C-alpha cells in the first residue's frame, strides 16, 4: 500500500514547467522536458521521473554541464537519416525533434534512423520509441552514459548503463514496450535507493577486489572514483550469461557514438582530470520502422497481440499468479496512479519546496498540510 503523499499530475507538470523556465529553458522546451519526466512516473519508473528533476536537470543547468537553451544543428541529412548536434543542450528537446523528423521520413520511405551527439540525459528511452508507436510504427532507441559498467571479467567502470528500448504497436490496450538498461541495475535505481534510505541488492556491483557492495550512497560515491562498477545484465562472469549483457552494452555504446562520430566511454564522465565539471557530450540513436511497408499495421498489431496473449496464457511457475509481457506493468501502474498523481517521498518533497521558495512560485503542496 502506497503511504507517500501524491502531487496531482497537473500541478507537478505546471510546477516543473515554471521551474525550468526560471532556469532559462524556453517554455515549449520546458513542456517537453516536464512531460518526459512525468511519463516515467506514469509508468511507475520512479528512477527516471520527478526523482531526477533537480539532481539531473536543474543542478546540471546550475553547474554549467547542461545548457538550458538547446541549439540544434543538423549536420547531415538524407531522405532516411539524420545526424544532429545537440550542442550540450537539453537531450530531451533534441530527441523530441529527432523523432518528429524520423517519423515523417518513415511515413514516406518505410524506415528512418538518426543519431545525436553532444547531448545530455534524454530521460526514459521508452518515451522516444513510444512516439513512434503512437504514429503506428516501431521505435528503437538507445543511449550511452557516464561510465559505470565493467566489462565481463573486469572491475573498472568503462561503459554506461546504456539502455536499449523497443516499442511496438499491438491490438491490446497497451503497446509492447521493452525499456531497460543493459546493466544489472541502472544508476537511477541506485540513486532512488539512496534517496529512499534503502540498500542496493547484493550481486549488482563489483569492487576492485571482486567483492560486492550494498550501501547505495557509498556505491554512487565510489563508482565516480572508479573503485566499483555495475555488472552487465547476466551478472558476474560467463556462467550466468554476463557476457551477453556485456555484448548488448557494447552494441549500444558503439551505435550511440560511432553513427555520429561522437565521444565514448571515459570521455563521457562529465569530469576533467582535475575533478572539475565538463559537458557530458552523450550520444543517442533512434530507428523507426513503418509496418505499412511490410504486411500492414493491422496485421502487425494482431500478430504481436497474439504472441503476447499466448505468452501470458502459458503455464505458470509454482507459486506465481501471473505472467507479464513488456509494457504491461507500466500500463497497470498508470491505471493505479492516473487519478492520484505523482508519489513523492521526503527527499523530493524537500526539493519541491526548496525550488518553490527560491523562485517565489505560487504553489502549495498537499504534503505541507
Residue spans of the language-model regions?
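Acidic, glycine/proline-rich low-complexity segments that act as flexible tails and inter-domain linkers
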Residues: 1-9, 14-33, 38-39, 50-65, ...
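Catalytic-core signal marking the mid-to-C-terminal active-site face
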Residues: 2-12, 254, 259, 263-369
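Active-site cofactor/substrate anionic-group-binding motifs, chiefly glycine-
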Residues: 48-103
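Residues forming anionic-ligand binding surfaces in small-molecule and nucleic-acid pockets
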Residues: 75-85, 96-112, 214-234
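A generic, well-ordered mixed alpha/beta core segment in the N-terminal half of proteins
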Residues: 81-171, 177-181
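Phosphate/diphosphate-binding glycine-rich loops and adjacent basic-rich segments that engage nucleotide
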Residues: 149-223
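Secondary-shell segments that build the walls of catalytic and ion/ligand-binding clefts
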Residues: 199-265
